[in-house]
């Protein structure tokens, strides 16, 4: 599976953007998001 770390190029401002594995945190421009809070599951590995 895809690692749930790093940056994603899409973020709706307040929605998860990392395949439900982690929540996203938008930057001030609202264009990118940072993946945070990885779950301890195989889906995030």
Swiss-Prot record:
Tissue: Expressed by the venom gland.
Protein's UniProt keywords contain Disulfide bond: yes
Molecular functions per Gene Ontology: ion channel inhibitor activity; signaling receptor binding; toxin activity
InterPro entries named among the record's database cross-references: Agouti_dom_sf, Spidertoxin
UniProt-listed Pfam families: Toxin_9
Subcellular location: Secreted
Coiled-coil intervals, chain numbering: none
Disulfide topology: 4-18, 11-24, 17-35, 21-44, 26-33
A GO CC term assigned to this protein in UniProt: extracellular region
Keywords annotated in UniProt: Disulfide bond, Knottin, Neurotoxin, Secreted, Toxin
Claim: Chloroplast is one of the keywords in the record: no
Assigned protein family: Belongs to the neurotoxin 02 (plectoxin) family. 02 (plectoxin) subfamily.
Known role: Potent toxin that may paralyze and/or kill insect pests such as H.virescens (lepidoptera), S.exigua (beet armyworm) and M.sexta (tobacco hornworm).
Domain description: The presence of a 'disulfide through disulfide knot' structurally defines this protein as a knottin.
Protein name stated in the entry: U1-plectoxin-Pt1d
């Amino acid at each position: 599976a895809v690692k749930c770390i790093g940056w994603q190029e899409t973020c709706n401002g307040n929605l998860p953007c990392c395949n439900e594995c982690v929540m996203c945190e938008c930057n001030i421009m609202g264009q990118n998001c940072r993946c945070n809070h990885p779950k301890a599951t195989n889906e995030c590995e």
